[in-house]
Amino acid sequence: AITQGALNLLAERIASQTSETTLLNAPNLFEASRCVGSALREMHQRDAEALRLQGIEFNASFILGGQIKGESPRLFQIYAAGNFVEATPDTSYFQIGESKYGKPIIDRVTRRSMPLSEAAKCALISMDSTIRSNLSVGLPLDLVIVRRDEYKISSHVDIDGNNQYFQRIRERWGEALREIFS
């Protein structure tokens, strides 16, 4: 409900067509991250106390990444308080939600020079590990790839239980792990 509320606020701000900076007219991703942070703070101010009274902790985070013409691709993690951090060469990715199961795979395998296809495969293996280890995480998954300087989605795949590529990766990963221990 918190993330949906923040997304609705962001959409309302775009539709209002005021001079205010929105996701649609932000000059860079830093300013876009400020827009998302502002929406989260507004949701917190409006709903946090009511949620607390129901025993629910106000906890929401977003990952915002992409490229605006004239700047390099950037990646931000935006926290529930509306503050945010930007990815660096030392921390080139972010995960939100249940990350403890799949994170070690990404930490050991990824490198900045890795082709997008390999990075996508690593992300899917990471998600498979999380799905296998936590009943609250499951399919379907959405995999979206945006290439540098293309300014559009180059690939969008909905991954469900029937996706043959995902099944093949799961099987190969499991076989490789079993082989190491035999």
Feature annotation, model-predicted:
Residues 1, 57, 61-67, 79:
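Short beta-strand segments
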Residues 2-4, 69, 150-151:
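Short, glycine-/Ser/Thr-/acidic-enriched flexible segments
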Residues 27, 31, 56-61:
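Glycine-rich, flexible loop segments associated with nucleotide phosphate handling
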Residues 39-44, 54-58, 65, 121-124:
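A short linear-motif detector with a strong N-terminal bias
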Residues 48-54, 63-65, 73-75, 131-134:
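A generic local secondary-structure boundary/capping motif
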